Amino acid sequence: MTDNKPSLSYKDAGVDIDAGNELVERIKSVSKKTHRPEVRGGLGGFGALCSLPTKYKEPLLVSGTDGVGTKLRLAMDLEQHDGIGIDLVAMCVNDLIVQGAEPLFFLDYYATGKLDVDTAAKVVTGIGKGCELSGCALIGGETAEMPGMYHGNDYDVAGFCVGVVEAADVIDGSRVKAGNVLIALGSSGPHSNGYSLVRKILEVSGCEASEVFDGKPLSEHLLEPTRIYVKSVLHLLESVQVNAITHITGGGFWENIPRVLPQGTKAVIDESSWQWPSIFNWLQENGNVTTHEMYRTFNCGVGLMIALEADKADEAIAILKSQGENVWQIGHIEDSSDNNQVEIK
């Protein structure tokens, strides 16, 4: 090292190790609140250890990973980060419950150009809340400060979740047949899908996110966290056999419903069985979006859809309502002679 050159540090290059350590200390209590008895050790190790619950005779592990998409851009623009962590967990655990799996543990990845500890702590606190709502443990994660890769304080998040299901109880759609009833569980809003279109509609409408619509600012409608259905559905599965569950995410009705239907069957959806939450009407009107495109992009008020035997529908609806869900019969299954597996009428 020569005397006429400055001594450079990692911080000079844009990576603040002290800020990262501060974040870790601030989120330890968040992780602790999500603890499950199967978890061995705490945060900070090179790997996280978790045993399988002893109640399972032939356990199968179910894994999923997801992000929040461009809902992040809206949250960053509005500087409202509290719900993003819940969204991240919800997008993963709701995919697991589709196969009947109980979420066990969750890991997150937070990447940014310049680490803002307060913002990151809000996001991770939301992740912890999502884990509490779904009964899974936050056992680890990665915070990556990468100057030059992201603009300013912009960030991205990704989540990874592992759950477990009894091998004999896997829900895979194979039992679905004509005559099954479809019940819907209401969404809390657009959840975490379609936000590139949401942002475009905001742009062309000329509306500000602070404008009040249906009793609260548009921003609150649009940043409402994704609803987590895990505990309600696990409670249902204790009493009622379910033939299929679908999570209405990217691709809407047209793409997600066929993912759980056997060939030769179709879902017939009764459009008169529910009213879209008002934010979807606002989006359709201000973006001049066709109804077909709405069902292709958004959940339109339906977060999950469940197929089951017709004589179990009333019991299932009662159980889910007792868990605080907005639930109703939305349609049924019919035989189909073509490749069209969704009919909305």
UniProtKB/Swiss-Prot annotation:
Family of the protein in this entry: Belongs to the AIR synthase family.
Gene that produces this protein: purM
Enzyme class name: ligase
Superkingdom as given in the UniProt entry: Bacteria
GO biological process: 'de novo' IMP biosynthetic process; adenine biosynthetic process
Reactions that this protein is recorded to catalyse: 2-formamido-N(1)-(5-O-phospho-beta-D-ribosyl)acetamidine + ATP = 5-amino-1-(5-phospho-beta-D-ribosyl)imidazole + ADP + phosphate + H(+)
A Pfam cross-reference name: AIRS
GO CC term (a single one): cytosol
Cell compartment(s), UniProt: Cytoplasm
EC number(s) reported in the record: 6.3.3.1
Alphabetical keyword list: ATP-binding, Cytoplasm, Ligase, Nucleotide-binding, Purine biosynthesis
SUPFAM superfamilies xref list: PurM C-terminal domain-like (SSF56042), PurM N-terminal domain-like (SSF55326)
GO MF annotation terms: ATP binding; phosphoribosylamine-glycine ligase activity; phosphoribosylformylglycinamidine cyclo-ligase activity
Keyword Nuclease set for record: no
Name the UniProt record assigns to this protein: Phosphoribosylformylglycinamidine cyclo-ligase
Main location: cytoplasm
